[in-house]
């Protein structure tokens, strides 16, 4: 088993955290792109933030690895390319993140039933009841005050502004 992280600065911390497990640890962009092509690997979980997941996903597809997709940005920036390559290399793409995984699981075995509509729900974000006047004064700090999670600034801002929901809509369109 292997774990690969893009940020080399966190290599020693990760190595220490996993020292009691029989896991090989690699770090760096080149390591990610190379490990996805390794012979003993059947499934590649792509869970990298933003655009960083694109190149490793392409290389994994070209190496005929099943893609367990947890990175919606890969499809947002290059969905047509990823879909074309997956068909060309006969590589399955299995969504493993939240709504898209649930949709995928509901559709297994439903090949004869064409999809008419997929509905993605949204809470409206933390500012859904704000007036236009209140919205004019919202700050980054306000958007980062999520009551339920601490997942980092990018995902918190993307969720608060509903950008993440927009990404999910694009992902659903490409996947289904």
What kind of region is each of these model predictions?
Residues 97-102, 144-176:
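Mid-domain beta-loop-alpha active-site segment that forms a flexible
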Residues 15, 33, 58, 83, ...:
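Predominant activation on well-ordered alpha-helical scaffold segments within soluble catalytic domains
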Residues 29-32, 72-75, 98-100:
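Short, acidic/turn-prone active-site loops that include or flank metal/cofactor-
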């Amino acid at each position: 088993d292997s774990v690969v992280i893009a940020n080399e600065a966190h290599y020693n911390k990760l190595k220490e955290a996993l020292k009691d497990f029989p896991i090989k640890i690699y770090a760096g962009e080149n390591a990610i792109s190379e490990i996805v092509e390794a012979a003993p690997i059947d499934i590649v979980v792509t869970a990298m933030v933003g655009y960083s997941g694109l190149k490793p996903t392409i290389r994994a597809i070209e190496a005929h690895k099943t893609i367990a997709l947890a990175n919606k940005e890969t499809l947002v920036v290059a969905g047509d390319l990823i879909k074309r390559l997956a068909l060309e290399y006969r590589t399955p793409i299995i969504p493993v993140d939240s709504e898209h995984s649930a949709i995928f699981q509901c559709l297994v075995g439903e090949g004869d039933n064409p999809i008419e509509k997929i509905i993605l729900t949204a809470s409206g974000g933390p500012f859904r009841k704000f007036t236009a006047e209140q919205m004019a004064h919202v700050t980054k700090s306000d958007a980062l005050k999520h009551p339920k999670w601490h997942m980092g600034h990018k995902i918190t801002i993307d969720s608060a502004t509903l950008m993440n929901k927009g990404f999910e809509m694009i992902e659903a369109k490409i996947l289904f």
